[in-house]
Structure formats: structure tokens, C-alpha cells
Amino acid sequence: MAVGTTTGELRELSDDELTDKLRESKEELFNLRFQMATGQLANNRRLRVVRQEIARVYTVLRERELGLAAGPGGEDS
């Protein structure tokens, strides 16, 4: 997942694409935690950024679930 993905950009994605981004971000977080445990992590800030991206994806999915935001193209998913 690219650094700096905004909530607005995430809102333009379909539910399937959001699920894929969530899976990718969780995999990246797992790998970063593993690197930290083995002392190979050079950029500690990346952990925080990835956690924030995961939270943004969950936020967009929850908005759609509650009907607070429409899916891409203005239609509910």
C-alpha cells in the first residue's frame, strides 16, 4: 500500500479493493513486526503509518456498513 493513501482515495475504491488493501496492509504490518523483533527494521515510523492506513480502511468500510457513505460512483455497496 502506498505511503500517504488518503481517506478520500479509499472512498473511491470498491469493497473488494478495500478488502485487498486491508489484507496487504496487515501482511506488511506482520512483516514489519517480524523485522522489528529480529532487529532488522530500519524505519520504525513505517509501523505507525501502516497501522493508520489499516484504521482508515476499517473506517471507510464501517461508514458504508452504517450507510453514512455511498460506495464508488454514488451507489451503496
From Swiss-Prot:
Domain of life: Bacteria
GO cellular component: cytosolic large ribosomal subunit
Keywords, sorted A to Z: Ribonucleoprotein, Ribosomal protein
GO MF annotation: an example: structural constituent of ribosome
SUPFAM superfamilies: Ribosomal protein L29 (L29p) (SSF46561)
InterPro entries noted in UniProt: Ribosomal_protein_uL29 (IPR050063), Ribosomal_uL29 (IPR001854), Ribosomal_uL29_CS (IPR018254), Ribosomal_uL29_sf (IPR036049)
UniProt cross-references to Gene3D superfamilies, sorted A to Z: 1.10.287.310
One Pfam family from the record: Ribosomal_L29
Coiled-coil annotated spans: none
GO biological process: translation
Listed PANTHER family: 60S RIBOSOMAL PROTEIN L35/50S RIBOSOMAL PROTEIN L29 (PTHR10916), LARGE RIBOSOMAL SUBUNIT PROTEIN UL29C (PTHR10916:SF0)
Family label: Belongs to the universal ribosomal protein uL29 family.
Name under which the protein is recorded: Large ribosomal subunit protein uL29
Gene name of this polypeptide: rpmC
